[in-house]
Amino acid sequence: MNPMLTNNSQPSNYTAGNAKGKIKKLRSACDACHASKVRCSGEPICARCQRDNVACHYSYRAHQGKPKGSLNRKTIERMKAAGFIEQRQRPAASQPPGHGTSRDSSVCASGTTTDNLLNFIEIQPPGESNESPVAIHATPSPCFAMTGGLLPDFDAANLDAFLEAYQTPEDSCLRAVEEFPGASPADMDCIFIGTPSSMSRDYTEVATCRCVREITQQINNVHAASADRSTTGLDDVLHYTREISACISGLLQCYSCGGQVQVFVLASVVLSLLMELMHPLLDSSTDTSRPRAQIRVGNYDMSGQLGDVLEKVIVRSIITKLRQVVDKFEMKADFLRSETAQAEFLKSEARRLKRGFGRIEEGTATLP
């Protein structure tokens, strides 16, 4: 009897049953060859063990199969059909934009679907005003009398002081670009540079953002239109509603300035001005000099009373859209990283805007 053949040595095709009735098979390589990761002859005493004069032992195979929790092809297909795969991949797609994201993703863009009624109306943007913005003095109106007073004065000097006090991410990036060797104006949209002002915030690198400039421009435009409310027509209000709704919706989703209290104050100012601009639309008397809605069916002029009815229907649609924007404004104000007094002020402004838009909606409920 060969001394190297022990009782622990079994042929490679040896099988045994366990307590559960499953068949266990031995490895095709002995333990020594398996540990050394070399080819084994598979004999009861392999050539390598016989050459080295060591005991040749064959162990049972390890548990075969996929790791616990893995998915096979059919399971993945069923999950795709049920929509679970998309839900797993959705959080990864909703991460903040990286280095290659263009500025267009952070510019004020509409986050909500535009009302179908507003989409069917062709709007010509009002003429650009060359006049310098003057002080905005809110005048008494039924809406403000019932919703809590007048809007505070907000002139061009205050705007300049505000923009100097509030350093936008774009300004900080542009100043740092001057120290960047070989940087061209075309590269400013894709450069991310951390500055001391941005390092003090929760984020260290932010994309270039034009939200503050956009909403300041909207304030100037609405103020120029409200200088003579008697000449403001329905098309002007529709145009400003679309522009302001898109700007505020993009601002609330912006990673750079969406958590700044000053930006929310600007949003409440422009919404208040827009609400004041909508009040002349409630006057259906023929004595007013404002442009009336002109409706023509072929060669027949259907303006007048039918135009007033259509105006009020469109105004109600505008109010619905603006109230959705104010709801998002109020929800976002709860998560601001600011003092409690500032957050409460912004929420009170949101409630005031809701009441004001509600008064306008009640005024359009009675059709002539």
Curated annotation (Swiss-Prot):
Residues 30-56 bind DNA. The keyword Iron does not apply. One of its GO terms (cellular component) is nucleus. Keywords: DNA-binding, Metal-binding, Nucleus, Transcription, Transcription regulation, Zinc. PROSITE patterns: ZN2_CY6_FUNGAL_1, ZN2_CY6_FUNGAL_2. Signal peptide: none annotated. GO terms for biological process: positive regulation of transcription by RNA polymerase II. InterPro entries: Stress_Response_Reg, Zn2-C6_fun-type_DNA-bd_sf, Zn2Cys6_DnaBD. Transcription factor that specifically regulates the thioclapurine biosynthesis gene cluster. PANTHER family: THIAMINE REPRESSIBLE GENES REGULATORY PROTEIN THI5, ZN(II)2CYS6 TRANSCRIPTION FACTOR (EUROFUNG). This is C6 finger domain transcription factor tcpZ. It comes from Claviceps purpurea (strain 20.1). The gene is tcpZ.
